[in-house]
Amino acid sequence: LIMSVEENRSRIDCGLEGVSRDASPERFRGIRIFDISDLERPKQVGAVQTCRGSHTHSVVDGPTADGKIIVYNSGTGGVRDDEEMEECVGNIAGDQRTALFRIDVIEIPISDPSKSRIVSSPAVFADPETGSLAGLWRGGDHGDETQDTRRTDQCHDITVFPSAKIAAGACSGNGILFDIADPYNPKRLDVVTDIGFAYWHSATFNNDGTKVIFTDEWGGGGRARCRAWDPLDWGADAIYDIVDNKLEFRSHYKMPAPQMETENCVAHNGSIIPVPNRDIFVQAWYQGGLSIMDFTDSSNPIDCLLYTSDAADDVRGV
C-alpha cells in the first residue's frame, strides 16, 4: 500500500503533535509504503521524502522483471527549505535545479521497500527547443471573458493506461497525454489548454483508453461554482477523444442543477463505471452532490442520474 503525504504537520514517526518549525528533521512529506499482508496489522516498510510532498501518486509499472514497482509522484505543495532537505531548490530565476516543473519517478524494490528512492525528477513541461523548464502555460487569462488559468508547474493527477503505455496528466494549467513506454522517461505526446479551465485537477480514461475526461477545480474546491450564472464550461469536465496520439476536444459537461451561493460546488474526483460497450462516468461535485453521465458519444454527453442534497441540512458533500 502506498500513501501520499503532503501536509507540513506530518511527522516521520506519525506522531500527533505535528511539526512547528520551518525546517525540521522530524517532518515527513512524500510517500509512505506499507506491507498489508496482514490487513489487521499494516506495517510501514518504506518511506521516500520529496521536495514538494506527495499530493497524488500513480503506480505506473510493476512488479518489473527485476522486482520493482515504479511510481509517479505529483507534489503540489511549496518547495521545502534546503535546510530541511538539501537537494530542494525553490523558485530561483534561472536555476535549473528547481523542484518546480517536475514530477518524481520513484522506484520501490519489493524485496526491500526500505531502499525505495527517487530515481529521477523529469522536467515534463520543458520546451524541447529552448530547454526552458516553464515550457507550457505561463499562467493568466486567455483574453477577454476567459478564465484565469494556473501556471503549469505541477501535475495534480496522473492516470495511467498500462496496456496502451500512455498516461493522462491533469497538470494545473494544461492537460497532457504522455507516452510511458519507458516508464522511467515519460514523454509528452500532446498538450491541450482550455480557456474555461482554472486548474486542471484530474484525468480519467474510458474503458478502452480511447478517451480522456479532464476536470477543472475552479475555486480550489472551496467555493460555490455551480450557481445559475456560472458558465457551464467553467468548473466542468472536458471530454477528449485520443486520435493518433493526439487529444481532440469533443465537449464539456457540468452538472445540470444550479446550486445555491452557499454550496461549495465544482467538478472534483470521478470514476469510470465499467459497463461493456458504453462509457459511463460518476462525478463528485462536493456539496453539489454527484452525477452520472454517459459519454459514449463524446460530443453529446447524456445525464443519467443526479443526486444533490440540501446544504443547509447536510454539509458533508461528496
Which role fits each region the language model picked out?
Residues 1-318:
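Feature marking well-ordered beta-strand scaffolds used for ligand recognition
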